[in-house]
Amino acid sequence: MMDEKELYEKWKRTVEMLKAEGIIKSEKVERAFLKCPRYLFVEDRYKKYAHVDEPLPIPAGQTISAPHMVAIMLEIADLKPGMNVLEVGTGSGWNAALIAEIVKGDVYSIERIPELVEFAKRNLERAGVKNVHVILGDGSKGFPPKSPYDAIIVTAGAPEIPKPLVEQLKPGGKLIIPVGSYHLWQELLEVIKREDGSIKIKNHGGVAFVPLIGEHGWRE
């Protein structure tokens, strides 16, 4: 198995490549990627592949997204210190760790699979991330107790934009969500809530995510 130094060197090269390709655009996203390397959020047998720009398996038949995809979503979200952010679909905990590093405050992340709640909590603890709160529940309903949010980032594909998530945004807030078919193809939408409560949608092109299962997502 590669040692930590080797893993980090490979990870640094991935970050440099994403920068050179114009995918990582901001210093804050670059800093977060360097502070929270992906190999801390996968099982030991996948650590040596963590620098590869592709999704990797995590427990319960789910995946950790490719680094370029995570960077794209974070750049669209344009997070700032002090923002109140909800993540839907904790998975490995990596994306939540990156968000927490950028906003420098508490981040709430919902996961519906108990095994992944435990997996993410272990990963976050190992990575020394203390400001991510992982909640077991149906992420398609959002998390009203800590709303309204400046941003909601959804890491699973929905059949349509879930109403509760829009309702839980602050005016001027952003929802980043893949919307489309069950498994194969979605479009990455940036949903901006206007001051009057109406929404403006920007389409950032085709993506492929695991399905968002829940009351306002897909049925199992």
Swiss-Prot record:
Give the catalysed reaction(s), semicolon-separated.
Answer: [protein]-L-isoaspartate + S-adenosyl-L-methionine = [protein]-L-isoaspartate alpha-methyl ester + S-adenosyl-L-homocysteine
- Asked if Transcription regulation is a keyword of the record, the answer is no
Query: Where does the protein end up?
Result: Cytoplasm
Reported EC number(s) for this entry are: 2.1.1.77
Q: Where is the active site?
A: S65
This protein's superkingdom? Answer: Archaea
Q: What Gene3D superfamilies has UniProt attached to this entry?
A: Vaccinia Virus protein VP39 (3.40.50.150)
Mind telling me which InterPro entries this protein's record contains?
Answer: PCMT, SAM-dependent_MTases_sf
Enzyme class, spelled out = transferase
Give me the Gene Ontology terms describing cellular component. cytoplasm
A GO molecular-function descriptor: protein-L-isoaspartate (D-aspartate) O-methyltransferase activity
Pfam families in alphabetical order: PCMT
Question: Single Gene Ontology BP term?
Answer: protein modification process
HAMAP family per the UniProt record, alphabetical: PIMT (MF_00090)
- Cross-referenced NCBIfam families: pimt, PRK00312.1
Q: Which family does it belong to?
A: Belongs to the methyltransferase superfamily. L-isoaspartyl/D-aspartyl protein methyltransferase family.
By what name is this protein known? Protein-L-isoaspartate O-methyltransferase
Species of origin reads Pyrococcus horikoshii (strain ATCC 700860 / DSM 12428 / JCM 9974 / NBRC 100139 / OT-3)
State the organism's lineage. Answer: Archaea, Methanobacteriati, Methanobacteriota, Thermococci, Thermococcales
Report which gene this protein is encoded by: pcm
